[in-house]
């Protein structure tokens, strides 16, 4: 059984304001700064119907400082501002910045699991309807093959000569584990960690009747993976509606139609 990291993360509600030094952590004119980029991406995800009704979340690791930036809980994601961000020191699990009005994201222990077990640069959590539908259709795994968009997803392997990541090929099968939902978000941590151990090459975990967690070595990669996987989940759902197994071989679909 996986050891749980959640006891190392302070997820208590903030009760104080922020000093000017705290505000410096989220004040930048650079649109690529994590505090700014989280706002941009959350608005984009909102209009994709991935984070409606305050659901979902996102976290980005600062590439220079290593600080973890996390969107707060219970906030309409399309209205987020940089000043709304929590900032965490990953080494201690304590907050360097706590906005006065908001609670830490309940996703925080799961985000930290991805940072620690996958060395992620960013983690995205959406309430994608395609993820929910796939979790109702499939049991322990989503398996899909022979679809062009699979080539956007990493295989978990590296090129022996260059050391660069190798993506899946058109003919490969993408496998995404599915874990059962819990009454409280933070209680998903152990199930997520077990999936990370059992599926060392996966870059996503679907949560049944809930949504999906997707991560990558950078925020750009995580965004690409999330978009590609959502597309593939929609294709898998529609293939199932036609009676076609999403991982069927090329040409085999004809016998199901």
From Swiss-Prot:
Keyword hit for Nucleus: no
GO BP of this protein: L-methionine salvage from methylthioadenosine
Subcellular localization, as worded in the UniProt entry: Cytoplasm
Enzyme nomenclature, EC number: 4.2.1.109
UniProt-recorded Gene Ontology molecular function terms: methylthioribulose 1-phosphate dehydratase activity; zinc ion binding
Reported cofactor(s): Zn(2+)
Pathway the protein takes part in: Amino-acid biosynthesis; L-methionine biosynthesis via salvage pathway; L-methionine from S-methyl-5-thio-alpha-D-ribose 1-phosphate: step 2/6
Amino-acid positions noted as binding Zn(2+) in the UniProt annotation, renumbered to this chain: 125, 127, 210
Active site, UniProt feature: 148
Record note on cofactor: Binds 1 zinc ion per subunit.
GO cellular component: cytoplasm
NCBIfam families, A to Z: salvage_mtnB (TIGR03328)
Family designation: Belongs to the aldolase class II family. MtnB subfamily.
HAMAP family: Salvage_MtnB_euk
Function statement: Catalyzes the dehydration of methylthioribulose-1-phosphate (MTRu-1-P) into 2,3-diketo-5-methylthiopentyl-1-phosphate (DK-MTP-1-P).
This protein's name: Methylthioribulose-1-phosphate dehydratase
Organism expressing this protein natively: Lachancea thermotolerans (strain ATCC 56472 / CBS 6340 / NRRL Y-8284)
């Amino acid at each position: 059984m996986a050891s749980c990291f959640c006891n190392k993360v302070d997820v208590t509600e903030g009760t104080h304001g922020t000093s000017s030094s705290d505000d410096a952590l989220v004040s930048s004119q650079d649109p690529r700064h994590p505090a700014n980029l989280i706002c941009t991406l959350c608005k984009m995800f909102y209009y994709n119907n991935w984070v409606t009704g305050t659901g979902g979340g996102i976290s980005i690791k600062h590439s220079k400082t290593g600080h973890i930036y996390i969107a707060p809980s219970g906030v309409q994601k399309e209205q987020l501002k940089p000043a709304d961000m929590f900032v965490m020191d990953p080494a201690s699990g304590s907050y360097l910045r706590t906005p006065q009005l908001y609670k830490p994201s309940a996703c925080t222990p799961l985000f930290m699991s991805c940072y620690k077990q996958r060395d992620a640069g960013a983690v995205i959590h959406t309430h994608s309807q395609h993820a929910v539908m796939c979790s109702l259709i499939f049991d322990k795994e989503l398996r899909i093959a022979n679809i062009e968009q699979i080539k956007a997803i990493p295989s978990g392997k590296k090129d022996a000569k260059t050391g660069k990541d190798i993506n899946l090929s058109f003919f490969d099968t993408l496998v995404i584990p599915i874990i059962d939902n819990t009454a409280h978000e933070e209680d998903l941590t152990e199930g997520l960690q077990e999936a990370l151990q059992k599926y060392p090459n996966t870059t996503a975990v679907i949560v049944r009747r809930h949504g999906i967690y997707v991560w990558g070595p950078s925020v750009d990669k995580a965004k690409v993976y999330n978009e590609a996987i959502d597309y593939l989940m929609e294709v898998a759902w529609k293939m199932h509606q036609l009676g076609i197994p999403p991982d069927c071989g090329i040409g085999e679909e004809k016998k199901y139609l």
